[in-house]
Amino acid sequence: MYKRQRKDGAFIKLKNLEETEPYFYTLQTMVSRIVRHLPEIDNKYFDERKDKPAGEKTTGLIVVTADKGLAGAYNHNVLKMAEEQMQKAGQTGSYKLFVVGELGRQYFGHRGIKVAEQFHYTAQNPTLHRARIITETILEQFEEEQLDEVYIIYTNMVNSVTTEPQMLRLLPIVCLLYTSDAADD
């Protein structure tokens, strides 16, 4: 009986993850449409900070892991990609690590890797309020030039069996991503 409940719980978590995917892509499409119809944009969120030497830039890495449960490749591949990106960012400047999920916090903590900010139990029970807290933290540091670019590293659910780690640049916003023919309806 316990195994059945556990499998059902994992199935429900997987189903919930799959249900968020259309929202993510719809949001990207909406941003594309808005940016495409704007005149030349001069906004702090589009600032590439080209005047700042590469060695002085700080990269923010938001690493999304599970709080509990779904283990294995779901977390392992994201953590591996995060470590690769930390090494890469460390070679050309510095990085700040922001961790969503208890397993990521434990992973980096056991390795003595400094985490700038950790967001507990956000992966297990995401809410708009928790998303706003993360957003405000990141935007504040970007606006104050404590961060020069921000990436999110997460697990993409290809299907119910296959997952793959993904990395997406959040800041500065790359206007060309949203104005190219690829972004057309």
Description of each model-found segment:
Residues D181-D185:
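A short, hydrophobic C-terminal helix/tail in secreted or cell-surface proteins
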Residues K3-S180:
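N-terminal assembly/interaction segments in proteins that build large macromolecular machines
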